[in-house]
Design a protein with these regions (language model features):
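Gly/Ser/Thr/Pro-enriched helix-cap/hinge segments flanking short amphipathic alpha-helices
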Residues: 23, 72, 91, 95, ...
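Long hydrophobic segments that form regular secondary structure
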Residues: 401-411, 416-436, 440, 501-505, ...
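Hydrophobic beta-strand segments that make up the repeating blades of beta-propeller
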Residues: 74, 118-125, 170-177, 224-228, ...
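Beta-propeller blade termini
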Residues: 105-115, 134, 157-170, 186, ...
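Structural signal for beta-propeller blades
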Residues: 129-132, 181-184, 233, 262-264, ...
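Bacterial N-terminal signal peptides
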Residues: 8-17
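Blade-edge motifs of beta-propeller repeat domains
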Residues: 25-103, 134-155, 186-206, 237-286, ...
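Beta-rich catalytic cores
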Residues: 104, 128, 156, 180, ...
Length: 644
């Protein structure tokens, strides 16, 4: 398969998808098919697939570089889980392929919606409705979407976030959409939800994307931040109910009139919110796909970092819950140009929030081949298209390491976190050794080649080492998925756009097969077995449910911590938790945020490595209260800490 840049410096967008007859997923010609069955057409010369055996062998040969435990494995247990969800992409990125932002996919979120101690999964979808799957225990799930009332089948959904909006002890749900109106659902505590969007006044109609809850003014009620990408659609409706994308959608960043700025809603209590964006001076520019929060300057107030899908990101400092001030130049003089995923976490166990950002769009400038996927992108676009000097940007992932003086050093290449076509990522201690690891969901699907998901093991803060083949995340069980069916003999669109290369030399019905790819992910202990598992939301395909066998391979020690605020918000969003054990000090933040459109951070999980005991646990609450526990806890259990 030959691919060309999604964006072009010239005035046209060029895409190509080249096939070679009916093929198997290995690239070899298949035997003749029945005349009554559609031909399956796989991309030809897919270097992403062809290189998998060699990449696996090469990675396994590097095992001796790992100082941490790696002799465990992830297995995709989708079938055993009972989950039958399938992501359905809208027509804009399938049969009538257009280069627009619909190909960015949707998120996934986790919460215990019914209070039974098991974490349930909410899959976000474009066409056909979202789905809520109840955790039955032992790795099994049941679809409860209908009785829960959270399907939203007639909207194009994008992101999701759970939070206890009214401090009732039950996680409520917020979902963003593309021009369908965002939705807030109230949870009755038993996993049944009621749409309270109208009274909450949060039903913005826009091209919304990521969202998260946080208490920006520390009044004990969680507020809501919503990112909006910008106008990339026309008023024409497609067959899936979506608004058809603009032909120059990826030039939208050059049209300020198309911008749709982020919105900050202040929680007034009792499911009522107020738009205070202008009041607090928040006005970041650009196409914001997602954002996250952390107390970057250590003054006790949560700040915000906004991603820009095409251009410079921005950091806004919280001044006492009254105003936000743009401090980007002071802290982050260069940022990724095509940012997609974001997460604050302490990768070096130094007690300070470091920042990882994935950059997918820079990888669309040109295809480097698999040997160069760990390098920054060689940008071919003009500076007029970039809307800035090349020297102003980082063209790839960025890992900002916070130093003792509060400044940040960009160390992505030094730390080995560059990946290819990355979307969202999730962070968690996958081998329970006290060092947070990274799972990166990636790939581009039709009409591009196969791209791998990445799993980066934290080598004790010294470097992240590629481990997706070592640990069984790659290669996938199924490398391709059906994308769309077309009748090459009768369909009037058969020789239009990418369909022309699909139907070239063919007659009758043809199914175009696409490389599989992931857009978002969550990390949590889905079976309460003590080890962290991974669930993905794959684009136009089924999810992957990666179950870890770590607990069966070695004796592991861990503690999970859930917070109960009193003066602070009920879930303790914004709290800082420090666990000291075995000479290692781990710091995590209750931010309720995963890497892209998603959420997987409740409860906090601390791997304890070989520590014989936990020495102390310290909680810094959003209210300003500090709490130190030096007894009353044990390993391998869930600990609930209530604010004094």
């Amino acid at each position: 398969m030959k691919t060309f840049p999604l964006f072009a410096a010239a005035s046209a967008i060029i895409l190509s998808f080249v096939f070679a007859g009916a093929q198997t997923h290995s690239g070899k010609s298949s035997s003749p098919q029945s005349v009554n069955k559609p031909h399956l057409r796989y991309p030809d010369d897919d270097i992403g697939v062809d290189s998998l055996p060699a990449r696996k062998a090469a990675q396994i040969a590097t095992e001796n570089q790992l100082k941490v435990f790696y002799r465990f494995h992830f297995t995709d247990r989708l079938k055993e889980s009972g989950i039958t969800f399938k992501y359905h992409a809208v027509d804009d990125v399938t049969r009538h392929f257009r280069a627009d932002h619909y190909d960015h996919g949707s998120g996934i979120a986790v919460a215990d919606v019914d209070g039974d101690g098991l974490y349930d999964i909410y899959f976000v979808n474009q066409a056909g409705g979202n789905e809520l799957w109840k955790n039955l225990g032992n790795g099994r799930f049941k679809n409860i979407t209908k009785e829960a009332g959270v399907g939203m089948p007639r909207r194009i959904s994008v992101g999701a976030a759970f939070a206890d909006v009214n401090n009732s002890g039950h996680p409520d749900l917020f979902v963003t959409t593309v021009r369908g109106g965002n939705v807030l659902f109230k949870n009755d505590g038993h996993g049944h939800f009621t749409d309270v969007t109208k009274e909450a006044a949060v039903g913005l109609v826009a091209h919304s994307s990521g969202a998260f809850f946080f208490d920006f003014d520390k009044d004990g009620l969680v507020d809501l931040l919503v990112c909006n990408v910008g106008n990339y659609t026309t008023d024409e409706k497609g067959p899936d109910g979506e608004y058809v994308g603009l032909k120059d959608g990826f030039y939208g960043h050059l049209h300020p009139d198309r911008f749709e700025h982020p919105v900050l809603y202040k929680n007034l209590g009792n499911y009522h919110f107020k738009d205070v964006t202008a009041e607090v001076g928040l006005r970041p520019h650009g196409w914001c796909g997602d954002a996250s929060t952390a107390d970057i300057n250590g003054d006790g107030w949560p700040d915000i970092y906004f991603l820009n899908m095409q251009g410079s990101n921005s950091y806004w400092e919280n001044e006492g819950g009254k105003k936000f001030v743009d401090k980007t130049a002071e802290y982050f003089p260069r940022t990724p140009w095509g940012a997609m995923g974001i997460k604050f976490f302490d990768y070096a166990d130094e007690g300070r929030p470091d920042l990882l950002i994935t950059d997918m769009h820079s990888d669309m400038s040109q295809e480097p081949g698999v040997d160069n996927e760990k390098k920054k992108s060689d940008i071919t676009w003009t500076e007029s298209y970039l809307a800035g000097k090349k020297s102003d940007f980082i063209f790839g992932n960025a890992l900002f390491h916070q130093l003792a003086d509060g400044k940040f050093e960009e160390v992505s290449d030094k730390m080995g976190v560059e990946t290819y076509w990355p979307w969202g990522f999730s962070v968690g201690d996958l081998n329970a050794d006290g060092w947070d690891d990274i799972f990166v969901s990636a790939g581009m699907s039709f009409p591009y080649r196969y791209g791998i998901n990445s799993l980066l093991l934290n080598n004790r803060g010294e470097k992240f080492l590629d481990s997706e083949f070592i640990l069984g995340v790659e290669p996938r069980k199924n490398l391709y998925t059906p994308w769309f069916e077309i009748d090459c003999s009768r369909d009037p669109d058969a020789m239009q756009g990418v369909n022309q290369s699909v139907c070239d030399g063919q007659s009758g019905k043809v199914i175009a097969m696409s490389p599989r790819s992931s857009r978002s992910s969550v990390i949590f202990d889905l079976d309460n077995g003590g080890a962290l598992d991974i669930v993905t939301n794959d684009f136009n395909s089924e999810p992957q449910v990666f179950v870890s066998d770590l607990a069966q391979r070695k004796k592991i020690r861990w503690i999970k911590i859930v917070l109960a605020g009193t003066a602070s918000n009920r879930e303790g969003l914004g709290a800082r938790v420090v666990v000291r054990a075995g000479g290692l000090t781990q710091t995590k933040w209750m931010d309720g945020k995963s890497g892209y459109l998603s959420q997987s951070d409740l409860p906090l999980y601390f791997g304890l490595g070989d520590a014989a005991k936990i020495d102390s646990i310290e909680v810094s609450w959003p209210s300003g209260r500090k709490q130190v526990l030096d007894s009353g806890f044990a390993e391998n259990r869930l600990l609930k800490i209530t604010e004094p």
